[in-house]
């Protein structure tokens, strides 16, 4: 009887997992070689800091983001010089083997003028992002919006309609706040603002369709700076539209705060089948590269099992059973070795990004965790025999000892990669 009960619970759990991990249907939007939406992999995006005034430096930054793994890179189109630099940046990317349409132009009220004034430069963009909250003001707002949409229609360029919590259409927000105040039991302000974001995005997308832009040329986003608001807004969006959704926590902050907030919000939504492309927006430390944002996007997707980008190294934190001097050094060395070798492996050994390696500190969980990985090594803890057991595909392969355990293990890793990924 107890066994039947457990089986029933497990069956219900499996069904729940199947529901949670099933992506919601959306249109497919093609941006050059990249497809956003449908059943396609979640797309990693980033944004160049730019603003150097040096087109060569700006191109190097975009190239660096692409080489780090960003599949689409957004740049600010806020001046004549900025839009005139796009063809050069595109050519740099093409010369390095990247998608010719991976640049996204992001502009505010000035972008309508720039696109009209420099159409040949704008044609080098793969996608254009516009913000309904500041595309224009007063009687210029709709005209600017429609000018961009008509340019996109004429030149087969997709559009992201990106609403931002910090630049929400003030007229829409004021109207909804006023209407809410007349209710018998008004909603809290944050609820009204969430609804305003969704309404702004959807009405703008429908207006773009009315002008003539096909639904499969539209991506939408509603950026907020708090995790609960992000989840609420995108859950609403997912229920009422079939446009692909661009996820991200705007103004996430820096350091651990930004990493945790972005990871929590994006992961929750993706695990509920919501979202088709992601960007992590972190405030960088002085001199820090924005490639960290790309790596974080990749780590989010890999940690929740949606995409693999690199060999996964699993390791325990260590405790008073482990020898920190040797164990922590081995973990560091293996991680560095894998990072250094990934570009070579990925070009010569297809599928290697799906490989897992376990580096464990003692006999308590070491052998078990190592057996779950493709390759694993269990170091001796205090009081254990001074040998390291190595496991391959769930079976014990050998034991290593001496002062060059790292070098011996690396040789085993290289041999495994050459045999199983070719």
UniProtKB/Swiss-Prot annotation:
Transmembrane segments: none annotated. It catalyses: (2E)-4-hydroxy-3-methylbut-2-enyl diphosphate + oxidized [flavodoxin] + H2O + 2 H(+) = 2-C-methyl-D-erythritol 2,4-cyclic diphosphate + reduced [flavodoxin]. [4Fe-4S] cluster binds at residues 316, 319, 362, 369. Keywords: 4Fe-4S, Iron, Iron-sulfur, Isoprene biosynthesis, Metal-binding, Oxidoreductase. One of its GO terms (molecular function) is 4-hydroxy-3-methylbut-2-enyl-diphosphate synthase activity (flavodoxin). It holds the Pfam family GcpE. It is an enzyme of class 1 (oxidoreductase). InterPro entries: Dihydropteroate_synth-like_sf, IspG_bac, IspG_bac-typ, NO2/SO3_Rdtase_4Fe4S_sf. One of its GO terms (biological process) is terpenoid biosynthetic process. Its EC number is 1.17.7.3. Binds 1 [4Fe-4S] cluster. Pathway: Isoprenoid biosynthesis; isopentenyl diphosphate biosynthesis via DXP pathway; isopentenyl diphosphate from 1-deoxy-D-xylulose 5-phosphate: step 5/6. Disulfide bonds: none annotated. Its cofactor is [4Fe-4S] cluster. It comes from the Bacteria. NCBIfam families: ispG_gcpE, PRK00366.1. Converts 2C-methyl-D-erythritol 2,4-cyclodiphosphate (ME-2,4cPP) into 1-hydroxy-2-methyl-2-(E)-butenyl 4-diphosphate. Belongs to the IspG family. This is 4-hydroxy-3-methylbut-2-en-1-yl diphosphate synthase (flavodoxin). It comes from Ehrlichia ruminantium (strain Gardel). The gene is ispG.
